[in-house]
């Protein structure tokens, strides 16, 4: 199926603004370590099927894995958050691995792809906020705030790995099937879907955990 090739929203080619990795760190008042504290890195980074080489993933039950290997944020979305938070946004604050210029998270759908050099990423799911995220932001209400904003971050699988660095141009291609955007996926996350809606989700290259949930719901319906 043919994919639509996109350029940046303002007519300029997209590019990698930042690549971010982190080490295991303890949250204040918590006994466990987290990899959410990420910082922009200089120079080239290898991205393989598990994500950015050298990046810490502490809670493997909910983070990381082949269908959640790279967490992407769009610069237009982060500009919005900067205004919302009333302070400059530092890359890595939300725990993202990659920031892409001229990209609004709300426009991205499951199955869309990001391509640069040898690297090919495919969108699988949206970021769902958790208590660790709220603690990172030092705001106990941040889960509700992030959900209400309806601009969730973007999880990707690695179709083909490669070495990348900040400043590299990024090509963006749209999934040719029915769109399941990040805001829609966030709104329906974990819900029981019926009929055409379930079929539409299963027709997209969605995160394997969501696929398993939807397939189990279909089995229960029979």
Indicate where each model-derived feature is located.
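Electropositive, beta-rich accessory/interaction domains or terminal extensions
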Residues: 2-134, 141, 177-222
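Short alpha-helix capping/helix-loop boundary micro-motifs
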Residues: 100, 107, 153-160
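Loop/turn positions that initiate beta-strands
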Residues: 111, 161, 166-167
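Residue-level signal for inorganic ion chemistry
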Residues: 118, 167-168
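Active-site glycine-rich loop that binds ribose-phosphate moieties when present
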Residues: 137-144, 149-158
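Hydrophobic, well-ordered secondary-structure segments
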Residues: 152-155, 167, 182
């Amino acid at each position: 199926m043919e994919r639509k090739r996109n350029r940046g929203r303002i007519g300029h080619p997209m590019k990698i603004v930042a690549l971010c990795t982190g080490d295991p760190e303890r949250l204040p008042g918590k006994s466990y370590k987290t990899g959410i504290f990420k910082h922009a890195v200089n120079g080239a980074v290898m991205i393989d099927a598990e994500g950015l080489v050298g990046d810490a993933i502490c809670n493997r039950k909910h983070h990381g894995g082949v269908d959640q290997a790279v967490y992407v944020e769009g610069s237009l979305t982060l500009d919005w958050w900067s205004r919302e938070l009333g302070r400059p946004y530092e890359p890595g604050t939300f725990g993202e691995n990659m920031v892409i210029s001229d990209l609004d998270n709300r426009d991205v759908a499951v199955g869309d792809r990001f391509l640069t050099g040898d690297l090919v990423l495919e969108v699988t799911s949206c970021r769902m906020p958790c208590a660790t995220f709220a603690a990172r932001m030092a705001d106990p209400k941040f889960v509700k705030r992030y959900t209400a904003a309806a601009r969730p971050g973007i999880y990707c699988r690695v179709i083909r790995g490669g070495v990348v660095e900040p400043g590299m141009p990024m090509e963006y291609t749209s999934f040719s099937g029915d769109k399941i955007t990040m805001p829609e996926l966030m709104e329906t996350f974990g819900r029981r879907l019926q009929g055409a809606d379930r079929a539409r989700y299963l027709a997209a290259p969605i995160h394997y955990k969501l696929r398993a949930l939807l397939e189990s719901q279909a089995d229960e319906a029979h």
